Amino acid sequence: MTFSIMRFNPETDKKPYMQDFELDVSAIQGKMLLNALEALREKHPDIGLRRSCAEGVCGSDGMNINGKNALACVTQLKDLPDRVVVRPLPGFPIIRDLIVDMEQFYAQYKKVKPYLLNDQEAPQKERLQSPEERAKLDGLYECILCACCSSSCPSYWWNPDKFIGPAGLLWSYRFIADSRDSKEKERLDAMKDPYSVFRCRTIMDCATVCPKNLNPAKAIRKIRTEMLQETESGE
């Protein structure tokens, strides 16, 4: 197989360029794209990429594979053509090769306060939920912050410092929907500006690329609905 990888070293290169590598994938251990990239790195150790668990859990090896954002560790080689084009996640500054600067992404994640807020007196044990209340979190808590969704979103490309983005808004709704959280109104009020939520144009790329098959656009729609209901009720 041929792997065309975007290369960029800011210390030596004026701009990114593509470099082709040939690899006999039948001779490597593993059946995933990440295994092939690791095999290439053994021969070319200057290729820069992020990886950690290699099990689709940590979200660290997100990249653009033949034009679609995905995790290299769960992308099977048998599903790819003989020529594979690999680029870094779009919309982020490139640190080196396939490694991008995700500082802005995490700043938007931090903005939504991704943790339980509850000003009620803490119980002696855990805060209980009914099975029905717990079920409302399905499709929300599974996000691994790989940034495949946000980096596929044109609205996020245009306003990365103002639009929270699909991943951040998915996490926001995960706590808005949590019965153990008592700050729903404060969370909604913090996003009632023209950009935080309402820059979503329902392009749906976020749901298309999510490796966990989550739907950030659905969560964004629910946030908007709750905002409108709150406005109509005069709260």
Curated annotation (Swiss-Prot):
Q: Which cofactor does it need?
A: [2Fe-2S] cluster; [3Fe-4S] cluster; [4Fe-4S] cluster
Q: GO molecular function of the protein, one example?
A: metal ion binding
Q: Which residues bind [2Fe-2S] cluster?
A: 53, 58, 73
Reaction(s) catalysed by this chain's protein: a quinone + succinate = fumarate + a quinol
Q: Which residues bind [3Fe-4S] cluster?
A: 153, 200, 206
Q: Where is the 4Fe-4S ferredoxin-type domain?
A: 133-163
- One of the Pfam families matching this protein, by short name: Fer4_17
Residues annotated for a ubiquinone binding in this entry? 158
Binding-site residues for [4Fe-4S] cluster, renumbered to this chain: 143, 146, 149, 210
Fetch the InterPro entries from UniProt: 2Fe-2S_ferredoxin-like_sf (IPR036010), 2Fe-2S_ferredoxin-type (IPR001041), 4Fe4S_Fe-S-bd (IPR017896), 4Fe4S_Fe_S_CS (IPR017900), Beta-grasp_dom_sf (IPR012675), Helical_ferredxn (IPR009051), SDH/FRD_Iron-Sulfur (IPR050573), Succ_DH/fum_Rdtase_Fe-S (IPR004489)
Top EC group: oxidoreductase
* Keyword check for Flavoprotein: no
Q: What is its EC number?
A: 1.3.5.1
* GO BP annotation list: aerobic respiration; respiratory electron transport chain; tricarboxylic acid cycle
Is Iron one of the keywords UniProt gives this record? Answer: yes
PANTHER family of this UniProt entry?
Answer: SUCCINATE DEHYDROGENASE [UBIQUINONE] IRON-SULFUR SUBUNIT, MITOCHONDRIAL (PTHR11921:SF29), SUCCINATE DEHYDROGENASE IRON-SULFUR PROTEIN (PTHR11921)
The Swiss-Prot or TrEMBL record describes its family as follows: Belongs to the succinate dehydrogenase/fumarate reductase iron-sulfur protein family.
Q: How does it assemble?
A: Part of an enzyme complex containing four subunits: a flavoprotein, an iron-sulfur protein, cytochrome b-556 and a hydrophobic protein.
Name of protein: Succinate dehydrogenase iron-sulfur subunit
Write down the species. Coxiella burnetii (strain RSA 493 / Nine Mile phase I)
Specify the taxonomic lineage.
Bacteria, Pseudomonadati, Pseudomonadota, Gammaproteobacteria, Legionellales
